[in-house]
Amino acid sequence: MLHWGPKFWRTLHLYAIFFSDTPGWKEKYEAIQWILNFIESLPCTMCRHHAFSYLTKNPLTLNNSEDFQYWTFAFHNNVNKRLNKKIISWSEYKNIYEQSILNTIEYGKTDFIGAWSSL
């Protein structure tokens, strides 16, 4: 069985964290296109369907990085709820992704993915 989920989430959360705090229309458009292409590339047909359905019901919020991060956080929790996995709080998300990703960039560590890999 291919375990692509943790890598998908890591990439999605990274994109949101590094999204601009003052995006222009072009950056917002590119983010929307990136998300659509990313969802389309999911290896699981049912997952693609669920992701597009979630996006339709919960449009992207691209006012700034924090809004985009919150959207990815809510999306991840939505999937975890459907899969009967752990739901995390916003503060847990911030701790897992923001701080861990910054540490990864600074120190070249990659072990942070384990924090949510079993969720």
Swiss-Prot record:
Cofactor(s), names only, from the UniProt record: FAD
Disulfide feature: 44-47
Known catalytic reactions: 2 R'C(R)SH + O2 = R'C(R)S-S(R)CR' + H2O2
One GO molecular-function entry: flavin adenine dinucleotide binding
Location of the protein in the cell: Host cytoplasm; Virion
Enzyme type, top EC level: oxidoreductase
Keywords, comma-separated and alphabetical: Disulfide bond, FAD, Flavoprotein, Host cytoplasm, Late protein, Oxidoreductase, Virion, Virulence
Any one GO CC term of the record: virion component
Keyword Oxidoreductase: yes
Pfam families: Evr1_Alr
Subunit architecture: Interacts with A151R.
Family: Belongs to the asfivirus B119L family.
Name of this protein: FAD-linked sulfhydryl oxidase
Source species: African swine fever virus (isolate Tick/Malawi/Lil 20-1/1983)
Taxonomic lineage from the root: Viruses, Varidnaviria, Bamfordvirae, Nucleocytoviricota, Pokkesviricetes
